[in-house]
A protein has these predicted regions:
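Conserved nucleotide-sugar phosphate-binding/catalytic loop shared by glycosyltransferases and other
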Residues: 4-54, 224-225
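Short, polar loop motifs at secondary-structure junctions
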Residues: 13-18, 80-87, 162-163, 207-215
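Conserved nucleotide-sugar donor-binding subdomain of glycosyltransferases
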Residues: 45-87
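Donor-nucleotide binding loops and adjacent catalytic segments primarily
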Residues: 145-147, 156-243, 253, 294
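Nucleotide-sugar donor-binding patch of glycosyltransferase catalytic domains
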Residues: 225-228, 258-307
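A donor-sugar binding/catalytic signature common to diverse glycosyltransferases
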Residues: 233-276
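C-terminal amphipathic helix plus adjacent low-complexity
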Residues: 298-329
Length: 329
């Protein structure tokens, strides 16, 4: 959209806003309160902790909707693109909801899943369109997360999306530890990885997913630490690595597929979406899967290096046709 000369406004807060500002310093970022979900230290507490915060999430959805109605009086946006935020739709704009999780997995059984899907679809159908960054065919990434038995009538599969580009660079024979996600699980995984990596005869680069300021850098002879990388720098770092160890975040999966990079996936404990996605990718023969509670880094690295996993080719340009069909010139 920027390349087509459109005026873009972003909205967010905290770490999200800081990352957007670093990537797009010339774009205005409006403060918009996030859902501010807190996460437990123990994975088995994840579902009850989230369930207890449902009233807070519903309140946040209502608040963001009224925030948008107020901002529309002064900005009058033509198009609103909502990244998984259910309240950001407006009748005077083309409102687009983006998500790969149309039918959330509760971890509480099929009845709970059906109820969540029903509620999710009711919200999504208030938008003009629902864009799913995946393919519609059987050879898809997200499985039943976005190919459920019931889907919104405004859904459009726009193909996987990634800003990464394949690089013609030499493999520098290091393993990339790519940390991300909410605390405290980000730090828990970091500590587990560093403890085991320090005893393995390999060279590691650890991108911690943290802002550089006020952060202490751990010490290790075979591990290089980087607090944060912009997308272009991260693109090059992934391209130069021999394999990546990371969470099963959907954006990360799309990036790795586009770059054709081997990876060990470690789902965030308790996050049913990541657990499902990691299991699915392993069963399809695409990636190596490790469970955080039973992490065996040495075994996982050997499996990943020795694997003959083949990810089929995906078209990462489908979304461009979808944007063109909207008349964005």
């Amino acid at each position: 959209m920027l390349s087509k000369g459109w005026h873009i406004t972003l909205a967010g807060e905290g770490k999200t806003a800081n990352l957007l500002s670093a990537e797009f310093p010339a774009i205005q970022i409006l403060p918009l309160r996030g859902y501010r979900i807190s996460y437990p230290k123990r994975g088995w507490l994840f579902i009850p902790t989230i369930m207890l915060q449902i009233p807070k999430m519903l309140s946040a959805i209502v608040n963001e909707h009224f925030w948008l109605r107020k901002k529309m009086r002064s900005h009058a946006w033509d198009i609103i693109v909502s990244d998984n935020r259910y309240g950001l739709f407006h009748k005077k704009a083309t409102s687009i909801f983006i998500s790969h999780q149309i039918a959330p997995i509760s971890g509480l059984g099929s009845m709970a899943d059906d109820l969540l899907a029903f509620i999710s679809i009711r919200f999504i159908q208030r938008f003009n369109a629902c864009w799913v960054p995946d393919t519609a065919d059987i050879n898809n990434l997200s499985g039943k997360l976005s190919h459920a038995k019931t889907i919104p009538n405004n859904i459009e599969y726009i193909g996987p999306v990634s800003r990464m580009e394949r690089k013609n660079v030499a493999d520098e024979n290091f393993i990339l530890l790519l940390l991300s996600g909410p605390e405290p699980q980000r730090t828990i995984l970091e500590n587990k990885l560093l403890d085991q990596a320090s005893r393995i005869n390999e060279r590691f680069v650890c991108v911690r997913g943290l802002p550089a300021e006020n952060q202490l850098t751990p010490s290790s002879s075979n591990i290089q630490f980087i607090h944060h990388l912009k997308s272009g720098e991260l693109n090059l770092m992934i391209a130069k690595s021999k394999l990546v160890i990371c969470r099963t975040g959907y954006s990360t999966v799309m990036d790795l597929i586009k770059l054709g990079k081997k990876a060990i996936m470690i789902p965030t404990p308790g996050q049913t979406e990541q657990a499902y996605l990691g299991k699915r990718l392993k069963e399809m023969g695409w990636y190596t899967l490790q469970v955080q509670q039973k992490l065996d880094l040495s075994k996982g690295i050997k499996q990943c290096i020795d694997s003959q996993y083949q990810v089929p080719p995906f078209n990462f340009d489908t979304y461009r046709k979808v944007i063109d069909q909207m008349g964005i010139q």
